Every structure is written in C-alpha cells, then in structure tokens.
C-alpha cells in the first residue's frame, strides 16, 4: 500500500481513511490536499478516481483545470480533451442538457473535445473507462496529425 501521488508507504489507518473517504490510496498529506480541492471545486469523487486510474495507466491529466470560464473535472492538454463527470445525469433537466451542449460547442470551436461520463461508469467500469479514454486520445492524436 503506497500513496498514488508520492509513493510513500501507507499505514493501515491512513490507507483505510483515504479509501473510506475518496476510494483511492493516498498518504495523509495528499489526502488532505485532495479534500481541500473537493471543498473548493465540488469535485466528484469519481473524477478523482478516474484521474488516478489514468495516472496509473501513464496518462498525464490535470484535475480541476481552469479553462478561463470554468473548472473542468479532468483535462488532458496534449490532445485537448476535456472530461466532465456527470454526477446527476439521471436528474438532468432539458435546460442543463442544452447548456452542456452549448458548452461542448464552444469548446469544440476552441479546438477542445469534451466528453461527459456518467459517474456510475467510473465507479463500476474504471478500467474500461480508462481504456476507452486512451482510445479517444489515440483518435484525437491521429486527427491532429492529419490536419
Ligand atoms: Zn502522498
């Protein structure tokens, strides 16, 4: 059991605390830092889990990236991919849905691709989600080369 951020060895209690509250293995310092980030940005837990899932797979992503207008849950700048975790997609109103579409349109115009992932997909299919994102990144990279 080591911290996913700094590789520090974790004791039983520290490991349990981090797993119980975030679902990821973090030392006391990085656990605290993550909780401050959540408090500040209202970050969904699944965004943190996906961020570390991507990191484990060797993908360099940013958590809570400020794009000048809003904070994006996860951004992969190399291929200009923004990932938003939909926590309450089941309660999505038509107004929120059209706002999401409009946001996606604006980010496309700026060269960014936005994908929205329902939080339960991250929770139950983390490995598959990571694999699909890596596939999307490869597709985007190929398209960038083609232009
Ligand atoms: Zn750490």
Predicted segments, located by residue:
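Nucleic-acid endo/exonuclease domains
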Residues: 1-147
